[in-house]
Design a protein with these regions (language model features):
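Bacterial N-terminal signal peptides that target proteins for export
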Residues: 1-11
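Cleavable N-terminal signal peptides
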Residues: 11-12, 22
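N-terminal signal peptide c-region/cleavage motif recognized by signal peptidases
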Residues: 17-21
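Structural detector for short beta-strands of small beta-barrel domains
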Residues: 26-58
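OB-fold/S1-family single-stranded nucleic acid-binding modules
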Residues: 51, 103-125
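Short, cysteine-centered beta-strand-loop-beta hairpins and adjacent loop/turn segments enriched
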Residues: 54-64, 104-106
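Beta-strand/loop nucleic-acid-binding surfaces
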Residues: 60-86
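Short nucleic-acid-contacting surface segments enriched for D/E, G, S/T with interspersed K/R
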Residues: 80-98
Length: 125
């Protein structure tokens, strides 16, 4: 059996005391019906769509307003990949997405700043 040096136990205790417990945030979800107004090709491929109806999963969720135009890159239903462009809807089509976002603190250039991680997965028809 290997013995650890005597100084390793206090170090481990000190490290545990200084590490704050990780806190998981909750994804905020909004069910949105959209009308595709444009399939943008340059500079970055994305969809532009007008919000027809938006239903938050809970009262505290911030959904885009009805009538607003949003731009996004469509994702697969599991949020794991961008939807292949051949499966993107065309201009004029009505679609449904389950918009998800997570607010948090991002780090960059040594400065922390508030940020939002967003996902735009399609809902199976």
């Amino acid at each position: 059996m290997t013995m650890l040096p005597a100084y390793s136990a206090p170090f481990a205790l000190a490290l545990a005391a200084f590490c704050a417990p990780a806190q998981a945030a909750t994804w905020q979800i909004c069910d949105i019906q959209l009308h595709v107004t444009e399939v943008v090709k340059r500079p970055t491929p994305k969809l532009q769509a007008q919000v027809l109806k938006a239903r938050p999963a809970s009262p505290s969720v911030e959904c885009p307003e009805e009538g607003a135009v949003i731009s996004f890159i469509p994702e697969t239903a599991d949020d794991q990949a961008t939807l292949p462009r051949r499966k993107w809807p065309g201009k004029g089509q009505a679609i449904r997405i389950k918009y998800r976002y997570l607010d948090g603190i991002c780090k960059g250039d040594g400065n922390d700043y508030p940020c939002r991680i967003e996902h735009y997965p399609f809902v199976a028809r």
